[in-house]
Amino acid sequence: MQVRVRLSLLLLCAVLLGSAAATSDDKTNQDDSLDSKSSLPTDESVKDHTTTGKVVAGQIFVDSEEAEVESLLQDEEDSSKTQEEEISFLESPNPSSKTYEELKRVRKPVLTAIEGTAHGEPCHFPFLFLDKEYDECTSDGREDGRLWCATTYDYKTDEKWGFCETEEDAAKRRQMQEAEMIYQAGMKILNGSNRKSQKREAYRYLQKAAGMNHTKALERVSYALLFGDYLTQNIQAAKEMFEKLTEEGSPKGQTGLGFLYASGLGVNSSQAKALVYYTFGALGGNLIAHMILGYRYWAGIGVLQSCESALTHYRLVANHVASDISLTGGSVVQRIRLPDEVENPGMNSGMLEEDLIQYYQFLAEKGDVQAQVGLGQLHLHGGRGVEQNHQRAFDYFNLAANAGNSHAMAFLGKMYSEGSDIVPQSNETALHYFKKAADMGNPVGQSGLGMAYLYGRGVQVNYDLALKYFQKAAEQGWVDGQLQLGSMYYNGIGVKRDYKQALKYFNLASQGGHILAFYNLAQMHASGTGVMRSCHTAVELFKNVCERGRWSERLMTAYNSYKDEDYNAAVVQYLLLAEQGYEVAQSNAAFILDQREATIVGENETYPRALLHWNRAASQGYTVARIKLGDYHFYGFGTDVDYETAFIHYRLASEQQHSAQAMFNLGYMHEKGLGIKQDIHLAKRFYDMAAEASPDAQVPVFLALCKLGVVYFLQYIREANIRDLFTQLDMDQLLGPEWDLYLMTIIALLLGTVIAYRQRQHQDIPVPRPPGPRPAPPQQEGPPEQQPPQ
């Protein structure tokens, strides 16, 4: 009996305390009413009410009366805690400024009362909110998209409401909030450091967030596993993540899964499935998917060739790339072809060696102004083995500018005009440097001053002065000046609209490699403005722009992986870039497969896949790829032996790219009658053409011609009067099937013997000493008037 009385008293106290807390909440929430802000109160001002029960058509039911008792006791406990302690990570003013551990210490989890909706009351359907009746839970008025309902008919009058979520939904939401914290902490480390150890630590955070089904973390980790970026490469794990993302409708996941089916990595190759996933990815707005589809429609890969469809996809991507171009320009990406680098080890790939960079740094520290400006430009744009670093660029430009270098002043002006984390944006400071550089006749400064007058940056807009400075810069060949002149003529700003002049200056700027010049030319050719409309030309120009996007940095990442002998990571990265239409990636992927360096591809699939990418690279005009296609058909690598097809590829390489190797091969095929009728005269002609096309071909051509002379002599004897004597003579049977190789070897040995003998003769002949200088005759000084003037 006493227990029941105590329990009754306890319940009565709890009810009274709960009523008092509810009254206090009602008064507090009146200031944040929906009528005044047209949005629901934040999670901090209203407790999160969920239920362990079920939601049926928006109506929430409580499982038992015991749940109500527990909720009242929970409310009493909650009322003793201040609301200031309940800090939500997603609504903190600057979540990226705190690490995950700091945020976790500050944030306390929102306590969930198991009492249905607000105050334990069920939803009232319909309910009135902003003069509109709702028959089910809604997310209107909330920025976070959470469903809610009112517990009375008119929300404006009573302001009683609650969230329409079960305890399971609330747990998922809290898990997502924690996952977001972990993801932000990882991204802060990833974006704030260039050290590999810290980036690996960042990916540990991202992996943890991905394990909690955080979509962005899943996207990051899946591609990191695919490429082996700071994580051990695992194609199967990447595939599973792509499938999970695809089920959730992630465009990045769909594009990744499409790539796996296109390349046959981790799955059986299926171009049909690849096309489906690429299409879904493009519909979701993924730029990589758009670029892949643009290339496929342009080249007719898996689809009917359609220039207009390719134009649609490429133009969309090019619009994004052009909008990202800054005044200082983006990072420079070096396109290095592995076949060329291996064939010509001494070839300059454009990459700077570490010791050379250190030498320039030494010169810069000693006050060499040219070295300071050069290093400043390298660090400003990146590339050639130097990472982009605006702080170092600013420091080097400052040193050179203080020494009076106009180029450094102009680039400082560009950095101040653009603004960054290192250099604060300042039109006044930029104008100061531009004027100093322009007064010294520097075209970069003149172009910057023209931009200031064109857009009114620190000065009044003055189109005449803008035109004047752009013309001065363009006359000195500066691409920015040429581009801006073209834009002024195209839009008729400060001058009469003139599409011919615009086309002229855009062409000049494009010859200097300016991305926006290519973009503007593409727009003109696509719309037929100032020129005859040409879909093909527009697509090629837009493709050029698209290949300058931020994803092109993956080319250098793949190259570095190859240099580190991580061939699997390199080939996967090159394969994705090859899907996007990069010719250099297609040839590099084919080269790695051709060398059988990547174990990620099966033995039986190596040559067929290499053949596929050699073919795509050859169709984009790469000579080595065209010759490789001939070699593959000649020897039967990845396909059947087909001399006629090999002959066609060699002939194309000879006619279109004037390849000495292709000419030599054509000579050999004419000599042997492989894929073509045997013709000794045509064989000699192609051998001679090869020797003229390349000095490197002269020695093998000489040997081939010597052998050809012997063959011609034997053929002549056969057709002479003593034909009957040699009718039965079969050189292959007499000397063996490789008799021509033996003959070439003998000729080479004889030639070497003659050369050695001649050199020895020259050494034996005593070299006469030159006679000593004769004493100069004494000079007689003439009279002073005959001396020449000094």
UniProtKB/Swiss-Prot annotation:
This is Protein sel-1 homolog 1. Gene disruption after residue 465 and replacement of the C-terminus with a beta-galactosidase-neomycin reporter gene construct leads to complete embryonic lethality; most die before 13.5 dpc. Only 5% of the embryos are viable at 15.5 dpc. Mutant embryos display defects in the differentiation of the pancreas epithelium. The defects in pancreas differentiation can be alleviated by pharmacological inhibition of Notch signaling (in vitro). N-glycosylated. One of its GO terms (cellular component) is Derlin-1 retrotranslocation complex. Changing residue 521 to A: Abolishes homodimerization. Residues 639-719 are annotated as: Interaction with SYVN1. Highly expressed in pancreas, white adipose tissue, liver and spleen (at protein level). Detected in heart, brain, spleen, lung, liver, kidney and testis. Its main location: endoplasmic reticulum. Residues 118-166 form the Fibronectin type-II domain. SMART domains: FN2, SEL1. The modification Phosphoserine is found at residue 64. Glycans are attached at residues 191, 213, 268, 427, 604. The chain crosses the membrane at residues 735-755. Belongs to the sel-1 family. Residues 734-790 are annotated as: Mediates retention in the endoplasmic reticulum. Residues 22-734 are lumenal. Sel1-like repeats lie at residues 179-214, 215-250, 251-286, 287-322, 369-405, 406-442, 443-478, 479-514, 515-550, 623-658, 660-695. Keywords: Disulfide bond, Endoplasmic reticulum, Glycoprotein, Membrane, Notch signaling pathway, Phosphoprotein, Repeat, Signal, Transmembrane, Transmembrane helix. InterPro entries: FN_type2_dom (IPR000562), FN_type2_sf (IPR036943), Kringle-like (IPR013806), Sel1-like (IPR006597), Sel1_AlgK (IPR050767), TPR-like_helical_dom_sf (IPR011990). Homodimer and homooligomer. May form a complex with ERLEC1, HSPA5, OS9, and SYVN1. Interacts with FOXRED2 and EDEM1. Interacts with LPL and LMF1; may stabilize the complex formed by LPL and LMF1 and thereby promote the export of LPL dimers. Component of the HRD1 complex, which comprises at least SYNV1/HRD1, DERL1/2, FAM8A1, HERPUD1/HERP, OS9, SEL1L and UBE2J1. SYNV1 assembles with SEL1L and FAM8A1 through its transmembrane domains, but interaction with its cytoplasmic domain is required to confer stability to FAM8A1 and enhance recruitment of HERPUD1. The interaction with SYNV1/HRD1 is direct. Residues 348-533 are annotated as: Important for homodimerization and oligomerization. Disruption phenotype: Taxomifen-inducible gene disruption in adult mice leads to premature death within 3 weeks after the onset of taxomifen treatment. Mice progressively loose weight and become moribund despite increased food intake and normal blood glucose levels, suggesting nutrient maladsorption. After eight days of treatment, the pancreas was diffusely dark red and soft, suggesting severe pancreas atrophy. Still, the endocrine parts of the pancreas were not affected. It is found in: Endoplasmic reticulum membrane.
